[in-house]
Amino acid sequence: MAIEFIRCKNYYNEINSILENLEKKYLLPEVVKEANFIHGEKLNAILKEVSRDMHENVKYYRDMQLDYREYIETWVHEIKTPIASTKLIIENNQNEVTNKIDSQMNRIEGFVEQVLYYSRSSNVNKDYMIKSINLDNVVRNVIKRNYRDFIHKRIKIDIQDIDEIVYSDGKWIEFIINQIIGNSIKYSNNKEQMIRIYTIKKTNSVLLAIEDNGVGIVPKDINRVFEKGFTGENGRRFSKSTGMGLYLCEKLCSKLGMKIIIESEVNKGTRVTLIFPLSGMATIEPCL
């Protein structure tokens, strides 16, 4: 009886010790030793059954997530066809009405793109391809995508020397820059609007700054702009916003080993800076 008690005490002490040092508690059944007394053997069997059931449930929900993502990607692919057809019709029948329709089609296209990147963002490691990219090429692609809005809102673009090579994924970076420039367009004001784009070369990083002279962001909102679904005062005042653009930018930057910072002053403008590390993780340094 005394021997059984000692075995039981040692067994539970070992379990408590493992739990205290185990970061992922659910792995307990995988690391606990086999018991050498009756009650311990029963507990071992229960733990193994619980572990097996947990793994089956995790696999079930992982498969569901994969199915959902594949459905979203198929849906995005299919919906791009009517969007492209509509834009072609608009291109061949330009007038005041079709120009307004084109503007709304661009919004729809942007929302569709957000859906695609959101579905991929949870598993971005399997989607991106790191290679050398020229920032000038990526930025000019984004400018071309938005040229109608620049003309319509009479926004001037000042692209300084941004002919820098960085290592990242071109499609992700283009999406991020498009979200930032899209915000500059959306929150422009009635005065002479300007978007200035430039780079700063640091010892261990390249900084790409996108600066506008729009309405700016109120101080109470500036620390929340990267929150999922946060629209803030500007989102309520100017247009219906999803609150997903900057959230996705920050999430993707983090997964790509980059940094994104935002500075703003009401009625003076906003500057968003992307920090591309040249080696390892970049350190945030003042832009000025």
Task: Specify the residue positions occupied by each region the protein language model found.
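Short helix-loop "hinge" at the ATP-lid/N-box region of the Bergerat-fold HATPase_c
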Residues: 184-185
